[in-house]
């Protein structure tokens, strides 16, 4: 049955963990969805969770669901603030959205320790430093 479904490829969509600001004591990070398409997205839904090993124990964060709604072409939307304490975990964002009547979905996975200064780039549209998966 699943073989009968078309493979809807997600392109020109990115998830980014963006450095919003910093003081000597703390860095503030926010996760953004970036729509690099020239068309709008509707019914955008993202579930997020973290999992992995911390201090020798398996840990999981709560699964959070974020309804973004509709996004204009070439736009971005904040998903959630993210605590640097979870950068040592695998952070997974499962995105689903519609273009017209066609549904698309994709998992974006930030591996442990991938959100580091040496991986920062300028995130398109947001125009701030961050780590992006496309």
Name every feature range the model reports, one short phrase each:
Residues 8-10, 24-27, 39:
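Short, surface-exposed loop/turn motifs at beta-strand boundaries within globular domains
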Residues 1-15:
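A general sequence property marking short-to-moderate contiguous segments
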Residues 54-90, 100-103:
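Intrinsically disordered, low-complexity Pro/Gly/Ser/Thr-rich segments with frequent PxxP/GP/PP motifs
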Residues 29-35:
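Short, well-ordered beta-strand segments enriched in hydrophobic/aromatic residues
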Residues 2-6, 80-134:
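Terminal connector regions
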Residues 38-55:
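Short acidic, flexible loop segments centered on an aromatic residue
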Residues 17-24:
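Short, solvent-exposed beta-strand/turn "edge" segments of beta-rich domains on protein surfaces
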């Amino acid at each position: 049955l699943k073989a009968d479904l078309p493979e809807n490829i997600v392109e020109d969509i990115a998830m980014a963990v963006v450095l919003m600001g910093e003081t000597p004591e703390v860095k503030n990070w926010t996760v953004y969805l970036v729509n690099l398409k020239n068309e709008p997205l509707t019914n955008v839904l993202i579930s997020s969770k973290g999992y992995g090993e911390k201090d020798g124990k398996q840990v999981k964060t709560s699964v959070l669901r974020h309804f973004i709604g509709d996004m204009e072409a070439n736009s971005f939307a904040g998903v959630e603030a993210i605590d640097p304490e979870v950068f040592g975990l695998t952070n997974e964002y499962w995105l689903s959205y519609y273009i017209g009547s066609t549904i698309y979905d994709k998992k974006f996975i930030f591996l442990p320790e991938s959100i580091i200064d040496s991986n920062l780039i300028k995130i398109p549209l947001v125009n701030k430093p961050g780590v992006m998966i496309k």
